[in-house]
Swiss-Prot record:
Family designation: Belongs to the HisA/HisF family.
Any GO MF annotation of the entry: 1-(5-phosphoribosyl)-5-[(5-phosphoribosylamino)methylideneamino]imidazole-4-carboxamide isomerase activity
Cellular compartments annotated: Cytoplasm
HAMAP family attached to this UniProt entry: HisA (MF_01014)
Keywords: Amino-acid biosynthesis, Cytoplasm, Histidine biosynthesis, Isomerase
InterPro entries xref list: Aldolase_TIM, His_biosynth, HisA_bact_arch, Isoase_HisA-like, Isoase_HisA-like_bact, RibuloseP-bd_barrel
Pathway where it operates: Amino-acid biosynthesis; L-histidine biosynthesis; L-histidine from 5-phospho-alpha-D-ribose 1-diphosphate: step 4/9
Taxonomic lineage: Bacteria, Pseudomonadati, Pseudomonadota, Alphaproteobacteria, Rhodobacterales
Source organism of this protein record: Ruegeria sp. (strain TM1040) (Silicibacter sp.)
Keyword check for Hydrolase: no
PANTHER family listed in its UniProt record: 1-(5-PHOSPHORIBOSYL)-5-[(5-PHOSPHORIBOSYLAMINO)METHYLIDENEAMINO] IMIDAZOLE-4-CARBOXAMIDE ISOMERASE
Name of the protein this chain belongs to: 1-(5-phosphoribosyl)-5-[(5-phosphoribosylamino)methylideneamino] imidazole-4-carboxamide isomerase 2
Catalytic residues identified in the record: D8 (proton acceptor), D129 (proton donor)
Amino acid sequence: MILYPAIDLKDGQAVRLLHGDMDKTTVFNDNPAAQALEFVAAGCEWLHLVDLNGAFAGEPVNAAPVEEILRQCKVPAQLGGGIRDMATIERWLDKGLARVILGTVAVENPDLVREAARAFPGKVAVGIDARNGKVATKGWAEETDVEVTDLAKSFEDAGVAAIIYTDIMRDGAMKGPNIDATAALANAVSIPVIASGGVSSLEDLHALKSCGAALNGAISGRALYDGAIDLAEALAVLKG
């Protein structure tokens, strides 16, 4: 399994939100590129980036810090937030991004996801953000009636590289991930699943690893910044 350290960008800073609420922000680093370099120096092989402002605006907002991270860090990075058309997808991939994460558009314009996955094999992931089993969009501000598993299964034959599954009520809360829902999703689809939201201890990582090969990785943010998870130990758990 791969550990994806999260760098969530708001107003040019690396932050964490509680339950996806933009009014409940903790700033962890004024220099996101420096934070990214710390993660890489510690042995991380991927970076998970989120343009929080972009997720609400529907277009890239924190492009400058993302581009700086891509310039300075020599490991692949995936980015979500505000990527809702082919031009934006192409622009980010041209700038060296390894993978784009399509969330809102996966609900509102699934054909774009399929088109992008065909055009850029291995470079398109679907972000499924859930609250009480239902998909939320537009920076988690809007809830839909779409079931998580139904949305995931609709992309079975689309060629997407991964599904990033986030339980919103666990995100930033340090209460552990939703293991049951994550495992159920991973076992319901053939697409690799990456778990996000609530990873707060080495025990959580052990629990996710026990879900089996269907789970490709885990994203952690606040626990790494707070020191609740030792990064070296976390990497060892997931590689072991």
